[in-house]
Amino acid sequence: MFDSLAKNKIVADKSFNRWMVPPAALMIHLSIGMIYGFSIFWPELTKLVGTECGPDVSFFERIFITSCDWMRSDVVWTFAIAIVFLGLAAALFGHWLEKAGPRKAGVAAAIFWGGGLMVTSLGVSLHQLWLIWLGAGVIGGIGLGLGYISPVSTLIKWFPDRRGLATGMAIMGFGGGAMIGMPLGDYLIKANGVGETFFIMGLIYLIAMTIGAFGYRVPAEGWKPEGWNPVAKKTNNMISSSHVHVSNAHKTPQFWLLWGVLCLNVSAGIGVLSVAKPMFQEIAASSFDPLIIGAIATGFGALLSLANIIGRIFWASSSDFLGRKLTYAIFFSLGTALYLAAPWAGINQYIATFVLITLVILTMYGGGFATIPAYLADIFGTQHVGAIHGRLLTAWSLAGIVG
């Protein structure tokens, strides 16, 4: 089995259909995308004991305490830790991924993400906050990073004629994982309890991601799509005549400009995600029955996830025609205008306008994620794009805290 994980064992033959690779990437990204749905766990994790901690119990004491409940602010740190370790893992293991191949990285991601959720289950059983952070945060975060970058360079090499479409397909599932995971998690919590849910979902994701990883193939050296002539395509914006090595990419101003672009885009998107649902409930409170406003707000949250998914494939594939630079110019100009308009729509209780504004912002949030790998390939070449993309994702780590 271990031999079948090696990169030289997954080189595709001439009869292989390149469209078999995107579904494999989708299985992995739909699994790790559940990190966006972790909000369903916070209420359950704050009432495991049934007794509130007194004001004299410090933050550090709550990390190990078993006699009273954690605060919501304690457990939500799990998400921030996971995003930080996503960026760190992507940066540290990106170069290893290029050598080891996507299948080995995908299996490692499955073990870390699935195993991390199982460790979290243990933390719930023992009521140890540090185990929650270690499981879903640190171990799971490493799985997120490995899983996130595992298909990127592979799909770019399979689709050199449509790099934007390729990265959109690779990253699309991450935005939609919560749409599947949240209803499943909610059902399992009601049926089994939150601790058991973490274990069951960890096992499900471990199996699903492993199956996805075994669907990965890499093209043979020199392969290109039938009928595609790279010489005829005058879109070469590379800063060098050859592929830029990962150890040199971060020494260029282009890398840091793209790093800043990603950080700003993600910070803005997280800023909207963090307030959109409660803000919607506030502005819509006078227009809907209080008994159904919660359900409507949940539906609004699902719409945001859908916009995130659509934006990843729409903007990334559109960038193949618009150009990467123009696409990001649209993100910044239109995004800034809409970001400033959202509070205005909320204050004046323009519900439909507020919903439309936030949905468009979320499409650009997802599109920014999905288009950046293709932009990197345009500038630095495809040979080390996975490793370079991994290092660029440290911007996500910072944005996860700032946003």
Which residues does each predicted region cover?
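Extracellular/periplasmic helix-loop-helix junction of adjacent transmembrane segments
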Residues: 41-88, 289-299
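Central cavity-lining transmembrane alpha-helices of secondary-active solute carriers
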Residues: 77-97, 302-315
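C-terminal ends and interior cores of transmembrane alpha-helices
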Residues: 111-125, 333-347
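Hydrophobic core of transmembrane alpha-helices in multi-pass small-molecule transporters
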Residues: 30, 116, 129-146, 263, ...
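A late C-terminal transmembrane helix in Major Facilitator Superfamily
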Residues: 169, 178, 365-366, 377-403
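Helix-loop-helix hairpin linking two adjacent transmembrane segments in secondary transporters
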Residues: 174-223
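Intracellular juxtamembrane helix-capping segments at the cytosolic ends
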Residues: 45, 144-159, 166-167, 366-380
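Extracytoplasmic gate region of multi-pass secondary transporters
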Residues: 36-45, 166, 247-317, 373, ...
